């Protein structure tokens, strides 16, 4: 499925349009399949993809992507008020990334 986070084929972080790699916003075997089905993928340039997986800043980058992914998922699939939508996302992916109380 096409990304619901960012429709343009460019790096999520810097906007580069070359040397792109597809990144699944949600990790793990089950969540990766769900992310594919729900469109929770983004393109990253090779530099940012390596930085995400290898650097000390990777966790911050990963959390930013997860928050963007959850917000996009709620806009596309959520039903009800924001609290209900967050609960729906949490049920599907096991965690809420928008609510700081869950971190």
Task: Spell out what each predicted region is.
Residues 10-41:
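Histidine-centered nuclease catalytic patch
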Residues 15, 46-49:
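Cys/His-coordinated zinc-binding microdomains
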Residues 1-6, 100-103:
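Arg/Lys-rich, low-complexity, intrinsically disordered N-terminal tails that contact nucleic acids
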Residues 32-42, 50-103:
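Polybasic, low-complexity binding patches
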Residues 23-27, 48-49, 53:
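Histidine (H) residue identity feature
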Residues 2, 21-25, 29, 62-67:
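Residue-level signal for well-ordered alpha-helical segments
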């Amino acid at each position: 499925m096409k990304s619901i986070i960012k429709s343009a084929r460019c790096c999520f972080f810097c906007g580069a349009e070359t040397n792109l790699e597809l990144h699944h916003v949600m990790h793990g075997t089950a969540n990766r399949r769900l992310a594919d089905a729900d469109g929770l993928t983004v393109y990253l340039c090779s530099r940012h993809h390596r930085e995400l997986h290898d650097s000390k800043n990777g966790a911050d980058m990963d959390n930013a992507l997860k928050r963007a992914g959850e917000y996009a998922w709620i806009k596309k699939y959520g039903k009800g008020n924001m609290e209900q939508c967050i609960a729906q996302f949490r049920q599907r992916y096991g965690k809420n990334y928008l609510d700081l109380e869950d971190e």
